A protein has these predicted regions:
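Phosphopantetheinylated carrier protein domains
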Residues: 42-65, 84
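Short alpha-helical elements of helix-turn-helix
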Residues: 9, 39-42
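Thiotemplate assembly-line natural product biosynthesis machinery
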Residues: 1-23, 74-84
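Glycine-rich loop motifs involved in handling phospho/adenylate chemistry
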Residues: 25-39, 60-68
């Protein structure tokens, strides 16, 4: 398992632990399906920052970063290259 896969697995785990939601696949559109809304984005950012030790300032984030698990993993990897 490479680092991107590990990141994606951790993000999926956050959805289970934090939101009691098991994702059907990594490519499910989190926004279109309503799995992520503005409140959950805030909660998710805080959890990601804590879990991965990164800083994700809201002014640097795009809504597209939250579309899918792979996009979230990519955003975290860009923020902290040593992780991804």
């Amino acid at each position: 398992m490479d680092e991107r896969d590990r990141l994606q697995q951790e993000i999926a785990t956050i959805f289970v632990e934090r939101f009691d939601t098991r994702l059907a696949s990594d490519d499910v559109d989190l926004i279109e399906t309503g799995l992520v809304d503005s409140v959950k984005i805030v909660e998710l950012v805080l959890e990601l920052e804590q879990r991965f030790g990164v800083s994700l300032p809201f002014e640097d984030l795009e809504i597209e970063d939250f579309r899918t698990v792979p996009r979230l993993a990519e955003r975290i990897a860009r923020t902290a290259p040593a992780i991804g």
